UniProtKB/Swiss-Prot annotation:
Record text on subunit structure and interactions: Homodimer.
Catalyzed reaction equations: (2R)-2,3-dihydroxy-3-methylbutanoate = 3-methyl-2-oxobutanoate + H2O; (2R,3R)-2,3-dihydroxy-3-methylpentanoate = (S)-3-methyl-2-oxopentanoate + H2O
Chain positions recorded as [2Fe-2S] cluster binding sites: C121, C194
Name the UniProt record assigns to this protein: Dihydroxy-acid dehydratase
GO molecular function, one term: dihydroxy-acid dehydratase activity
The keyword Magnesium belongs to this UniProt entry's keyword annotation: yes
Length: 560
């Protein structure tokens, strides 16, 4: 075992003495057992993580019962909702790399034999997965589970996005401050990851398709007693994985990546999933090109529409309808779409995991013969405005905005854009351009939930598009095109756009262009002053110097 490095031989007496002092090693026999890290992300700032301390306790008990010695440690975490719309959002994506580094550091420094990862919200799941793949010790994931949707006294179903959009409605006088207060009180009724198919839930669902989590991981509610049972079962699997030396790079293969992307497309997951899955692939040293998503989308039906794409369905409804296993079972009817022989941490193949699944509600999970769309709910757009690609959540775009041409309204930061939208500068037909908010320019590629919610709240969702080298919350909806690559800070064409330039977004054609010739774009970019970083010290300054483009997952450079 790896852990023998710190526990075997007379020269390791000091190490054993310290391990005994932790209270986790209680008998001499414990030194012959696998040492398992319980990588928790409990903290009291994130509603999706406030309950994870109890799940950690359950996981430790399960590991002991299975014959291992558990050691719990924590990672940091950022609540994207609380960080939204201010400087804190610049730290959100950047926190993913800190989490990956933290996992690597603890596992390698203490020679752990295996990991049980307990994430829940946006950057924590991919960060832990990146760290696990880097160390390549056996691992199983079990998330904290989704939040239940809220309900107003009148019976209307609401969630966090309802609150953000209500701010825009309040600013126009469509609703009163008292009505806004009602939505605020009801939008987030308890612990768990926010209740729609936002980034956190998207990633936790993808864990099932990737093979790293047990069935139910993505959809069983945080407050459901079945969540505790799932934690116990998942943690109980790790000893078998350690003994059989089943490593994460054996689980994460190119075909399991394609399985996950197919699920993502079928349920219209967050655009952030593309960013994170590319980063995960990078850690596993798998080649996966941004453009392949469109080829996969062409044969993947969009069969499960969840908030924010609709206000009628939330994650709890997906669970009631059969969960992720039911979606995958339905997708397996499309010849050649899924590799059902892919291995998983259950010890069974993906096909065996979903064999008994069935769709229990066709209003939530449609058949592949009658999908919402014959193509997937995410797409990559190319053109002279995004030579290296940009991402849009097609499943959350209204039919009226699938093709749109309009004049650019350019803002060099998110704050200016929010002000412009809220004070009425943005008009019907405009294409809002928010730039210098990419991985390097932001820095940290902040999410644009506040401006997209303001557009929706002010009644412009069917007439205004928004493009950015930043990214979007999984809760954003509308004609929102993000991850524009190259970013403005790297002098991509988005840096050349001026207010009034005509921009065409053609989602069916996977195209996004600005009505400028190549020479004009070149001349405008050459005339720009040298890009000056917004933050010059601390972690974000270091991050900005090392981060790569969104089309490669915004991972950090490893070639110095």
């Amino acid at each position: 075992m790896r852990s023998d490095t710190i526990k075997k031989g007379f020269e390791k007496a000091p190490h054993r003495s310290l391990l005994k002092a932790t209270g986790c090693v209680s008998t001499r026999d414990d030194f012959s057992k696998p040492f398992i890290g319980i990588c928790n992300s409990f903290n009291e700032l994130i509603p999706g993580h406030a309950h994870l301390q109890e799940l950690g306790r359950i996981a430790k008990e399960a590991v002991r019962e299975a014959g291992g010695v558990p050691f719990e440690f924590n990672t940091i975490g950022v609540c994207d909702g609380i960080a939204m719309g201010h400087v804190g959002m610049r730290y959100s994506l950047a926190s993913r790399e800190l989490i990956a580094d933290s996992v690597e550091t603890v596992v390698e420094a203490h020679r752990l034999d295996g990991l049980v990862c307990i994430p829940n919200c946006d950057k924590i799941t991919p960060g832990m997965m990146m760290g696990a793949l880097r160390t390549n010790v056996p691992v199983v994931f079990v998330s904290g589970g989704p939040m239940k949707a809220g309900h107003t006294p009148s019976g209307k179903t609401v969630d966090l996005i309802s609150v953000f959009e209500a701010v825009g409605k309040c600013s126009t006088g469509e609703i009163t401050e008292d009505e806004l207060q009602t939505v605020e009180e009801c939008g987030c009724p308890g612990c768990g990851s926010c209740s729609g198919m936002f980034t956190a839930n998207s990633m936790n669902c993808l864990c099932e398709a990737l093979g790293f989590a047990l069935p139910g991981n993505g959809t069983i509610l945080a407050a459901d007693p079945r969540r505790n049972e799932l934690v116990k079962a998942a943690a109980g699997r790790i000893i078998d994985l350690v003994k059989k030396e089943v490593r994460p790079r054996q689980i994460l293969t190119r075909t399991s990546m394609l399985n996950a992307f197919a699920l993502d497309l079928a349920m219209g997951g967050s655009t952030n999933t593309i960013l994170h899955t590319l980063a995960i692939a990078s850690e596993a040293e798998l080649d996966f090109d941004f453009s392949e998503l469109n080829d996969l989308s062409a044969k993947t039906p969009y069969i499960c529409k969840v908030s924010p794409a609709t206000t009628e369905v939330h994650i709890e409804d997906v669970d009631r309808a059969g969960g992720i296993s039911a979606i995958l079972k339905e997708l397996s009817k499309v010849e050649g779409l899924l590799d059902l022989s892919a291995p998983t941490v259950t010890g069974k193949t993906l096909g065996e995991n979903i064999a008994s699944a069935e769709v229990l509600d066709r209003t939530v999970i449609r058949s592949v013969e009658e999908p919402y769309s014959t193509t997937g709910g995410l797409a990559v757009l190319y053109g002279n405005l995004a030579p290296n690609g940009a991402v849009v959540k097609t499943g959350a775009v209204s039919p009226a905005m699938m093709k749109h041409t309009g004049p650019a309204k350019v803002y060099d930061c998110q704050d200016d854009a929010i002000a412009g939208i809220m004070n009425g500068d943005v008009k019907s037909g405009d294409v809002v351009v928010i730039r210098y908010e990419g991985p390097r320019g932001g820095p940290g590629m902040p999410e644009m939930l506040s401006p997209t919610s303001a557009i929706i709240g002010r009644g412009l969702g069917d007439s205004v598009a928004l493009i950015t080298d930043g990214r979007f919350s999984g809760g954003s909806r509308g004609a929102c095109v993000g991850h524009v690559s190259p970013e403005a800070a790297d002098r991509g064409p988005i840096a050349a756009v001026q207010t009034g330039d005509m921009i065409t977004i053609d989602i069916p054609a996977r195209s996004m262009t600005v009505a400028l010739d190549d020479e004009t774009i070149r001349q405008r970019i050459e005339a720009l002053p040298k890009f000056e970083p917004k933050i010059k010290k601390g972690y974000l300054a270091r991050y900005a110097r090392m981060v790569t483009s969104a089309n490669t997952g915004a991972v950090l450079k490893n070639d110095f």
